[in-house]
Amino acid sequence: MAPIKIGINGFGRIGRLVARVALQRDDVELVAVNDPFISTDYMTYMFKYDSVHGAWKHHELKVKDEKTLLFGEKPVVVFGRRNPEEIPRASTGAEYIVESTGVFTDKDKAAAHLKGGAKKVIISAPSKDAPMFVVGVNEKEYKSDLHIVSNASCTTNCLAPLAKVINDRFGIVEGLMTTVHSITATQKTVDGPSAKDWRGGRAASFNIIPSSTGAAKAVGKVLPQLNGKLTGMSFRVPTVDVSVVDLTVRLEKKATYEQIKAAIKEESEGKLKGILGYTEDDVVSTDFVGDSRSSIFDAKAGIALNDNFVKLVSWYDNEWGYSTRVVDLIVHMASVQ
């Protein structure tokens, strides 16, 4: 099958990393990037050098002209349009658009890409009205008549596979999630204005900042049987990448911690291989930089109070793992056409 032609709208953290993932795969072809705020030469610099994931070491990258980047001999067309309707998709052949600006996150706004000639839009963020899919959990529910979808959030992608295994095997009565989450681009380097979230305006580099997250509730959208059973919060911490989910649940069926570990290990080596990981090593956050899995269960970090009440810990590279799932979702969608 010919590679799936994709375009990226918004060349921020996720946009650039989706590009890195796509350019290292044979099943997709990056043909276009749109960002109205970045010149082609600056785009090249931002892509080539990355403080977390290192310098680009694959194809040689250079600017052919102000509208074209060359990855080796592979041209990628660059646009700078604010309105997605104005991007001439037909000229590049881009059918699947990764919407990673953080602006066009509902169906009405994302539909501008369809008006511009795109076939499908994948929002790289939670959406209030677009159907959400988590690869490994509910992607099989995707139907070809859905043209705008959401890849949910990085935290939902970590939590959902773990919650699915636990619920399928033992049943979840209720649970609370905390994610200890690395800094993101929306935070402040020093104390600054943040009218909607006062604590969120405090300096990211030397504070632990409590924050809200809809990730746990969103699990109920991809796993309806858990709707209303989970909620959660976040602590933003001064690390640049890799986050960790702490899921504390009450179980329907009694299970020892050893039985829970065995169930997760079995799934990580079976149906969820490549999505859900399992480790008994004495790991820390930097050990997962560049890990493409959505969720890596830390067997040594969890604890059980009794056979019905347990705390489970799972790591995720909130940048690289999530960006890999965006591309995986595109490949799955194309297979359903």
From Swiss-Prot:
SMART domains: Gp_dh_N
Annotated metabolic or biological route of this protein: Carbohydrate degradation; glycolysis; pyruvate from D-glyceraldehyde 3-phosphate: step 1/5
Binding site for D-glyceraldehyde 3-phosphate: 153-155, 184, 213-214, 236
GO biological-process terms attached to the record: glucose metabolic process; glycolytic process
GO MF: glyceraldehyde-3-phosphate dehydrogenase (NAD+) (phosphorylating) activity; NAD binding; NADP binding
Catalytic activity from the UniProt record: D-glyceraldehyde 3-phosphate + phosphate + NAD(+) = (2R)-3-phospho-glyceroyl phosphate + NADH + H(+)
EC number: 1.2.1.12
Keyword Oxidoreductase: yes
One term under GO cellular component: cytosol
Subcellular localization(s) per the UniProt record: Cytoplasm
Enzyme class (EC, first level): oxidoreductase
Residues with site note (Activates thiol group during catalysis): 181
Family: Belongs to the glyceraldehyde-3-phosphate dehydrogenase family.
Further comment found in the protein's record: Plants contain two types of GAPDH: cytosolic forms which participate in glycolysis and chloroplast forms which participate in photosynthesis. All the forms are encoded by distinct genes.
Function, as annotated: Key enzyme in glycolysis that catalyzes the first step of the pathway by converting D-glyceraldehyde 3-phosphate (G3P) into 3-phospho-D-glyceroyl phosphate. Essential for the maintenance of cellular ATP levels and carbohydrate metabolism.
Record protein name field: Glyceraldehyde-3-phosphate dehydrogenase, cytosolic
Classification lineage: Eukaryota, Viridiplantae, Streptophyta, Embryophyta, Tracheophyta
